[in-house]
Design a protein with these regions (language model features):
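Conserved G1/Walker A P-loop phosphate-binding module
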Residues: 1-75, 79-81
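Active-site phosphate-binding and catalytic loops of NTP-dependent enzymes
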Residues: 30-32, 99, 171-175, 198-209
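Active-site glycine-centered loops adjacent to acidic/histidine catalytic or metal-binding residues
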Residues: 58, 119, 149
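P-loop NTP-binding site
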Residues: 184-293
Length: 293
C-alpha cells in the first residue's frame, strides 16, 4: 500500500509557518525571518519514502490586502484550502485566536483532517498555553491541537508521525527523487530577497522583487545575473548604498548562501532597476510569477 497527499500549511503572518516547513522537509526551502509577510509564493517541499510521498506546502500569511500583490498572495493561501488532504493551521502563543475570523470560518467548515499547531511554546507558560488550547477548541472543535516549537524542533516528530497516519492511500504525485515543485532560479531569487529582508528596514524589503536573468551552470560553478526591482528611484539609492557598499554586502551574503545551497562555486552579478508601482500592476505581477495555478 502506498500513501500520498498534500499537506498544506496556512495561518497568519509571522507565526512560524516557514520555519515549520523547513523542519518537516529537512531542507531550507522557505525564507524564515523575523519580519512578517516574508513568504510571497506557495512553495512545495516533497518528502519521499519507499511507500509514502508527503507534499508539504508553505503559503503566504493571511492578511487583508493593501496591494494587488497581496491579493495574489491571499489567493495562494486560499488555494491551499481547496486542494489539501491534510491542513496544518499554524498559530502561536501571542496571537489573538480571533484575529482572522473570515479565514478561520473557512477552515472550520473543511471536511479533511485539520491539525491546529500552537507554535513558539518555548516563549509561554503552562497556564497561558492551557487557556489558548481551550479557546482554540471552541473556535475549531473538529481540529486536533498540538503545541510545538518549530524553531527548537519540539513536537515536530510527533506531528510528522501523525501526518503519516492521516495520509490517504494514493500513488505518488511527483517523481520520487523530486524535492520541490520550484526551479533552481526561484530559490536563487528567494535567497537574494532574504538578504534584503535582513539588511534593510521599513518598507524597502516589501517593495523589492528579484528576477534571475541568467543562470548558467556547469560541473563546478554557476554564473548568475539578478535584477533587483524597486518601485521608486529613492529606493534604488538605498538598495545600492554609499559607493555601492550596501548592495555589495547583500550580494556577498547571498553568494555565500547560494554556495551552501548548491554546493558549487557561485559567480553573482546584481543590478537594481525601478519598476514603478509594480505591486499594483496586474501585468508586472504576472511577469513576476504571482498568478495562482
Amino acid at each position: 500500500m502506498h500513501k500520498a497527499g498534500f499537506v498544506n500549511i496556512v495561518g497568519n503572518p509571522n507565526v512560524g509557518k516557514s520555519t515549520l516547513m523547513n523542519q518537516l522537509v529537512g531542507e531550507k526551502l522557505s525564507i524564515a525571518t523575523f519580519k512578517a509577510q516574508t513568504t510571497r509564493h506557495r512553495i512545495m517541499g516533497i518528502v519521499n519514502t519507499e511507500d509514502t510521498q508527503i507534499v508539504f506546502s508553505d503559503t503566504p500569511g493571511v492578511l487583508k490586502p493593501n496591494y494587488k500583490m497581496q491579493e495574489m498572495m491571499l489567493q495562494f493561501s486560499e488555494s491551499a484550502l481547496a486542494d489539501a488532504d491534510i491542513l496544518l493551521y499554524v498559530t502561536d502563543v501571542v496571537e489573538d485566536p480571533e484575529k482572522n475570523m473570515d479565514f478561520l470560518e473557512k477552515v472550520s467548515k473543511m471536511s479533511i483532517p485539520v491539525i491546529l499547531l500552537i507554535n513558539k511554546i518555548d516563549e509561554s507558560d503552562q497556564k497561558t498555553l492551557g487557556n489558548l488550547v481551550t479557546k482554540w477548541h471552541g473556535l475549531l472543535p473538529n481540529a486536533e491541537i498540538l503545541p510545538i516549537s518549530a524553531k527548537n524542533k519540539f513536537g515536530v516528530d510527533i506531528l510528522f508521525k501523525r501526518v503519516h497516519e492521516l495520509l490517504p492511500e494514493s500513488p505518488a504525485f511527483f517523481d520520487k527523487d523530486q524535492l520541490t515543485d520550484k526551479p533552481a532560479k526561484f530559490f536563487v531569487s528567494e535567497i537574494i530577497r532574504e538578504k534584503i529582508l535582513r539588511y534593510y528596514d521599513k518598507e524597502i524589503p516589501y517593495s523589492v522583487e528579484v528576477v534571475i536573468e541568467r543562470f548558467k551552470e556547469d560541473d563546478r560553478q554557476i554564473h548568475i545575473s539578478a535584477i533587483i526591482y524597486v518601485e521608486r528611484s529613492s529606493q534604488k539609492g538605498i538598495i545600492i548604498g554609499h559607493q555601492g557598499m550596501a548592495l555589495k554586502k547583500v550580494s556577498t551574503e547571498a553568494r555565500k548562501s547560494l554556495e551552501r545551497f548548491f554546493d558549487k562555486k557561485i559567480f553573482l552579478e546584481t543590478f537594481v532597476k525601478v519598476d514603478k508601482d509594480w505591486r499594483n500592476s496586474q501585468k508586472e505581477l504576472k511577469h513576476f510569477g504571482y498568478s495562482p495555478e
